[in-house]
């Protein structure tokens, strides 16, 4: 006998948690069930050690604003990401202010920086600063080529550096470090207190549509072969990170045809030595190597995890065919179907430089990888650093009318035409834009309910519907309010 519920959220990460809280705030009478394959929430991509945790706000990530062919830098994409991050930040602040999260310990003030180390990159960074400085959301950004000034911002990165090497840096004091694992756990604890049912160690075996439009999920207990649970729901969200593609394919919806996935793993060096970690307080992004994918931009990060400061450097791109860190090596081959084979072949052929880059990364020894860290931290001691494997990222491959198939970086909502099922595919900027992504998904899936949500959404997100960059006075008010509530 199937257990009936209004909403099923598959995946115990930041996306399901965010959507769950939004739905509970806007539709408190709806019954919600959250399913997670592992023994707890936030153990895959939302875990603090499996994501960059930058609070992506485009302050330091150079790949969001490349130099155009005309020599001009367009800040539009960076502004869009910054606006989205501020929507998330407002939502988190409201939940803290209303006592719905335990505290604000999931977010910390950590400056964001960009550091480049050759003349061409220094010239680019100056142009980027000039383009960004005129924008409200980036107005406090600083730029310098002065070695002493840069040393004040990031002393470890300048100590021992060649005096003749050109350097330039952007610095944004208002950057943050977000522990999405802690935030997810707090959100799910709140949901459990509101009656949301959580089912852990549950693997989705099958997804079927019934004649009345309901979705039926057959799940198995990963610890007990006899522990079957069947759920029947009128709305299904597939937010299982890299695992969402496999679930989307199981659903059989026509909108999911032609989608494929390309998994990329990431390695990082981690330093938990307090003496070193306390000397660096910034997230510092560099410029990506030629041919490197966007998720491989090198960065030396301050990370605050469970109240302790660490340093992380990476990522080093790798390849494993599983879609989740704790997934199966058969994930990629089993995801290849007749409807996505051609798009995947076309995308693979068009991205041979990326393939060569990944092969080169895979061949690197630990010593060769550490040499990259020395470019950013010249006096780094190998004994202080351990190499860890972060989470899997599954980049989207989709049909394209001209090219046959394209590899797409970013996130994408794939929903059934009637709004009864939605999946979130892709990766960066990911978690930092969870709130606007889930609000957009809700409007797409429940257009008839959206008008009744407007008032509460404006309470949850005080600047809802407003572009902060285009409303300077309102931006000052909202940014000051969220900074006070979140203690950043």
From Swiss-Prot:
Listed EC numbers: 1.1.5.4
Keyword Oxidoreductase recorded: yes
GO biological process: tricarboxylic acid cycle
Keyword Oxidoreductase: yes
Domain of life: Bacteria
Pathway: Carbohydrate metabolism; tricarboxylic acid cycle; oxaloacetate from (S)-malate (quinone route): step 1/1
Protein name according to UniProt: Probable malate:quinone oxidoreductase
Source organism of this protein record: Neisseria meningitidis serogroup B (strain ATCC BAA-335 / MC58)
